Amino acid sequence: MFFSSKLTKWTYWHAEKDASLGKAHKTGKGVAAGVNLARDLGNLPPNDCYPEYLSGVARELAGQYEKLTVKVVSQAQAEKMGMGAFVAVAKGSERQGQIIVMEYKGSKPTKQGPVALVGKGITFDTGGISLKPGANMGEMKYDMGGAA
């Protein structure tokens, strides 16, 4: 490894003095906050990060941003909507299943139409449990990472 003993140049940008940096700084902070939240949710055990908890976090997040809305579909509502596969999986838990629908309405309408991102938010997926080695059971909590 090479370590320089002399500092030859130091450059410092300040967001308040350069508008383009201010926007980039704000975007960077938002991305970092999202990454940190997803990591923190993924690290929670499933007895702490269960469907109601995850939907509560989504609602809190929507409360912080006016362009973000959250609708939660309960297990009973999902059953009425004919979502049999979801309801069947949810019945395998002592907790009620929930579907979280988050919508971000940006400031500019686009000609391309909306973009939809779908993330699997199953907080502890036991599908195929008989096929999974016991040593990896603890990692099933990460199945909700796509939604986080």
What label would you give each PLM region?
Residues 1-123, 136:
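N-terminal hydrophobic/helix-forming segments and targeting peptides
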Residues 58, 115, 126, 130-148:
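Alpha-helical metal-binding/catalytic segments enriched in His/Glu/Asp
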